[in-house]
């Protein structure tokens, strides 16, 4: 189970000192009930008894030793290693030999683990291939089969084939996959769409939610809930009928709304926040408050410089990863200082728009099945959420949606996340028109739209542009009749990706688009990744709509 712990042998030489100088934020002391507003969530039910341990829990002090000494340049490498024998035997062997004078940690790891495979060279195209041909030829390279799973690895077995993003990401990711699916549909790969539909439904059935990705260390959180959008895509492309997924949609909704009924005003539990007027809105959350397995050392270092209890920082870092925007000024109290992260204190506009879509989808499919009471219930939930979003997250003075800091009771930053309400049909036409003006003046560039207008060094900020944001902006504005802006973003983005492709013969995770010639996007915790799943998916779909750039 997720919370299972073993007692490691004490190890003075592996201790990491953390100097704590706790800061006091007066705004966070305003109400006594806020101090106890977040009871510890119960353990997630329904996880399989075997192979659900994270590498950190399974290898204990060996894991800390490897990560704290930075044995691998990328902290994700060791959690993705697969053991060559029973993990308990490996741990016992480690405890026997680790204090020997000639102990070699690297040799020990290489003798006992299979290292992750690197396939980066395969993402580079034949220069003679068109952009469309390059993407279509990448799908087999990015496909993983169920039989590739090794016992006791952190990789969670899935029943069907799936697409990975590429680079360091050798597993499937929840919200990435939706944007990848757009391209699969355009490429005529209904076979892979069906496989991925079955996989995500299977994860909901077995885990009660769709994890961040199919790794044990991702089970404690999800990602932006886009399964309702996937179901809509399956229906549109004739892959699977929407009716078969009604129960899965309800299960996902229950995961996101767990604990809502028992919340008092100004209280939060897991993903749900009860606002001062009694309305319910959601935030990102992770059930663990330890360093992320895949970014262990980075998280420990960030917590060191935060001036807050480490477990609070770890929770906010994990919640930031659950948002898909890891990381961004959206979650920071002090722009440019990751240690100031407060993800769990923000009500995100994109998350609540996606949940509005989920509520609407449940209502619509229930109507198709003749379940009138369920339809009425979820239409009301969607209506209530839209009203709450308009009350707390719509900035009428500036004509845009913004995240909301529920602790401080004030609006937070404006970002490209504000276009998600348009993508899911949550806004009215006046809001869409006003938002278009703000996006034009603050986010639009000759290369597409930037994630934010703030340059912080984080990857989900200026100057970077990301494929999913372009797609939702293009379709969102066109949905409300602003074809001119939608088309401009589409042409700008296709020009960006094609320019880079013509020079480097590959697609990448993100692009620097704030001015001048488009180039590789930077920032964040890891090097730029090639591949790249959702870039391929969005660009392939846009080529189908607009032709080759």
Swiss-Prot record:
Its EC number is 3.2.1.28. Substrate binds at residues 168, 175-176, 212, 221-223, 292-294, 324, 525. SUPFAM superfamilies: Six-hairpin glycosidases. One of its GO terms (biological process) is cellular hyperosmotic response. Keywords: Cytoplasm, Glycosidase, Hydrolase. It is an enzyme of class 3 (hydrolase). Its main location: cytoplasm. One of its GO terms (cellular component) is cytoplasm. Belongs to the glycosyl hydrolase 37 family. Monomer. This is Cytoplasmic trehalase. The gene is treF.
């Amino acid at each position: 189970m997720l919370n299972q712990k073993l007692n490691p042998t004490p190890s003075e030489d592996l201790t990491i000192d953390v100097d704590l100088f706790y800061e006091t934020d007066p705004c966070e002391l305003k109400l006594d009930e806020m101090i106890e507003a977040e009871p510890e969530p119960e353990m997630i039910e329904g996880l399989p008894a075997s192979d659900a341990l994270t590498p950190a829990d399974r290898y204990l002090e060996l894991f800390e030793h490897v990560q704290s000494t930075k044995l691998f340049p990328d902290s994700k490498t060791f959690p993705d290693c697969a053991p060559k024998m029973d993990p308990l035997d490996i741990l016992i062997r480690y405890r026997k030999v680790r204090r020997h004078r000639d102990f070699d940690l690297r040799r020990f790891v290489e003798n006992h683990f299979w290292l992750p495979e690197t396939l980066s060279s395969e993402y580079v195209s034949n220069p003679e291939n068109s952009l469309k041909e390059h993407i279509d030829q990448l799908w087999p390279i990015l496909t993983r089969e169920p039989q590739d799973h090794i016992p006791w690895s952190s990789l969670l077995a899935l029943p069907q084939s799936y697409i990975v993003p590429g680079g360091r990401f050798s597993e499937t990711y929840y919200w990435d996959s939706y944007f990848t699916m757009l391209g699969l549909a355009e490429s005529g790969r209904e076979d892979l769409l069906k496989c991925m539909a079955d996989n995500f439904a299977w994860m909901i059935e077995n885990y009660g939610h769709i994890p961040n990705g199919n790794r044990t260390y991702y089970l404690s959180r999800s990602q932006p809930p886009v399964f309702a959008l996937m179901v809509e895509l399956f229906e549109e492309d004739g892959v699977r009928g929407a009716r078969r997924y009604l129960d899965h949609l309800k299960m996902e909704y229950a995961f996101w709304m767990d604990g809502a009924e028992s919340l008092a005003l100004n209280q939060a539990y897991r993903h749900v926040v009860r606002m001062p007027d009694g309305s319910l809105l959601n935030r990102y959350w992770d059930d663990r408050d330890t360093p992320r397995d895949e970014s262990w050392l980075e998280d420990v270092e960030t917590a060191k410089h935060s001036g807050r209890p480490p477990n609070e920082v770890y929770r906010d870092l994990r919640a930031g990863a659950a948002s898909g925007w890891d990381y961004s000024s959206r979650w920071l109290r002090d722009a440019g200082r990751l240690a100031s992260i407060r993800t769990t204190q923000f009500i995100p506009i994109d998350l609540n728009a996606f949940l509005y879509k989920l509520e609407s989808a449940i209502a619509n499919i229930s109507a198709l099945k003749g379940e009138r009471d369920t339809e009425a219930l979820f239409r009301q939930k969607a209506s209530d959420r839209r009203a709450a979003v308009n009350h707390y997250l719509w900035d009428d003075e500036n004509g845009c949606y913004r995240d909301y800091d529920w602790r401080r009771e004030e609006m937070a930053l404006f970002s490209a996340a504000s276009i998600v309400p348009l993508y899911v049909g949550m806004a009215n036409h006046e809001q869409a028109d006003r938002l278009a003006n703000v996006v034009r003046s603050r986010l639009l560039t000759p290369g597409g739209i930037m994630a934010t207008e703030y340059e912080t060094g984080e990857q989900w900020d200026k100057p970077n542009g990301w494929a999913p944001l372009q797609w939702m902006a293009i379709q969102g504005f066109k949905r409300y009749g602003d074809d001119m802006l939608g088309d401009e973003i589409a042409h700008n983005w296709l020009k960006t990706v094609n320019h880079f492709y013509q020079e480097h013969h590959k697609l990448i995770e993100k692009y620097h688009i704030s001015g001048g010639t488009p180039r590789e996007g930077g920032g964040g915790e890891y090097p730029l990744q090639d591949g790249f799943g959702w870039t391929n998916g969005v660009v392939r779909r846009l080529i189908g709509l607009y032709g080759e750039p």
